[in-house]
Amino acid sequence: MKHFTQDENKSTMIKLDMNIWQSLINDSSKRKIPRYMHQIWISSVNHEEMYDRFQIAANSCIELHLNYNYTLWTHEKIKSWLTIYYSWFLPIYENYRYDMQRIDAMKYVLLFHFGGIYIDLDLKCKAQDLISAMLPLDKRDNEPDIILHMGAEGISANTDIMAAKRFHPFFKLAVSQLKAANRWFYLYHLTIILSAGPTFLYGIYRQFPFKNVFYYVPNSLLFGKLIECVGGETWHGQDTILISRFMKNKMWSSFMAFALIIILCVIFKILKKARYR
């Protein structure tokens, strides 16, 4: 695939990618994020049909975004699409241990290839044109390259809702590091968040030198006013419950934050050694 080549110096290539990307995209693409909404449903053995509450939430987003292109990406649709456009990524996708890893990885691939907005199926839309609604008035004519919102602990970049311009080097970097990050971290929850989830993406964010391309939506604006969670967390396991209980205790919360910082440092070293794939 043309956008990814082997044996690249990461730091040099990020800067080169930004220069090329900024010079090649047209004026309209520079100003606006594509109005394309992506959602992903990958079924498991026990839950082949989408939960009703997810379908209701998805319908709310579709109805409020009739001027957006919309795709619900299923496992079969993803595999067919990857076979045509990203055949080199298909083995990476299939080699994940858990469906949630596949979902997280595909968020980055789809936002890189198409641009637009990704939103989890457990989020109900409450506003039209979410891309514009997430931005202050002075940023709506010339939209930022990437829209994110950060986790409360400052050690993760939430991946439940994200928006980006097409072929952006930030998501190129994310996709290029997924293979190297696909490791077992001894706990189910840690494996999810560190190999492809929010903590993985925060590691990519830390590596990316052009911080001015990001806009961070305040959680106080996002939740309750623009979107509403209808009850997700279907991927959570028993260790997630245990970790959550620890995090409610201040002493354990500090310990867990410290442990995650150490793990992040290890991840950064792994990703630093890895080359683009």
Predicted regions and their residues:
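Glycosyltransferase-associated regions of secretory-pathway enzymes
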Residues: 1-103, 121-277
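Small-residue hinge/turn detector
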Residues: 104-116
